[in-house]
């Protein structure tokens, strides 16, 4: 289990419709909440008021939401909607009916709108595993460090950057690598279909150029 300090326990049940009732969202997204989610509990609040930790410059609180699912998966659109509606950094604990669970977190930055809004940059999740196998690093000097440790722990190998690099730079580097991977896949598919030898050679040179950036 996550073994979060008892002082952080909040334990408030949140009605599913709270996340979309006043928003202009499609009936399909509403159906995701109805059909894929059984129960949402705001389980913990990680903050200087609930833990022995200093304030951060960019992170004031981390909210933990325990979501019990009706089936095996939760569509990412539901998580994104919840993440965007809550003006704090969020850690999701998703639990399947069989008791297996995973953690999900999005690296998010304050939007330049002045209304406490956030912009989601990149989302990460652990593999599905037994609940007692889920652990979080809670040793940090301040809330910024705690948040960074959680994101890095959840992301694991999906974050292609050394720990010495800032989290912001690490996320941007990972996004750039994923963009290059998509471009390479498209170019390789085009080269397989291309009949013209000169165009094949041109595509091959572009593939080599992008591979050099990986």
Residue positions per predicted region:
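N-terminal, leucine/charged-rich tether regions that mediate assembly and partner docking
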Residues: 1-102
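Extended assembly-interface/linker segments at domain junctions
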Residues: 76-165
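Short, charge/polar-rich alpha-helical segments
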Residues: 161-175
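Non-transmembrane amphipathic alpha-helical segments
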Residues: 173, 177-194, 210
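Short, charged, amphipathic alpha-helical segments
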Residues: 197-208
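Charged, long alpha-helical assembly modules
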Residues: 208-214
């Amino acid at each position: 289990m996550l073994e979060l300090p008892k002082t952080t326990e909040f334990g408030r049940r949140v009605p599913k419709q709270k996340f979309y009732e006043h928003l202009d969202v499609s009936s399909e997204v509403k159906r995701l909440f109805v059909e894929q989610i059984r129960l949402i509990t705001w389980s913990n609040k990680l903050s200087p008021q609930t833990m022995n930790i200093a304030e951060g410059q960019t992170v004031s609180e981390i909210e933990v939401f325990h979501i019990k699912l009706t089936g095996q998966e939760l569509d990412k659109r539901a998580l994104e909607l919840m993440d965007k509606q809550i003006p704090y950094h969020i850690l999701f604990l998703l639990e399947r009916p069989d008791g297996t669970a995973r953690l999900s977190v999005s690296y998010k930055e304050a939007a330049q709108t002045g209304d406490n809004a956030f912009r989601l940059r990149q989302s990460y999740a652990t593999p599905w595993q037994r609940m007692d196998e889920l652990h979080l690093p809670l040793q940090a000097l301040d809330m910024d460090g705690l948040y960074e440790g959680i994101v890095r722990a959840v992301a694991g190998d999906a974050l292609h950057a050394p720990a010495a690099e800032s989290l912001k730079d690490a996320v941007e580097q990972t996004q750039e690598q994923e963009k290059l991977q998509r471009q390479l896949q498209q170019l390789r598919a085009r080269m397989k279909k291309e009949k013209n030898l000169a165009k094949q050679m041109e595509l091959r040179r572009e593939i080599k150029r992008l591979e050099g950036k990986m």
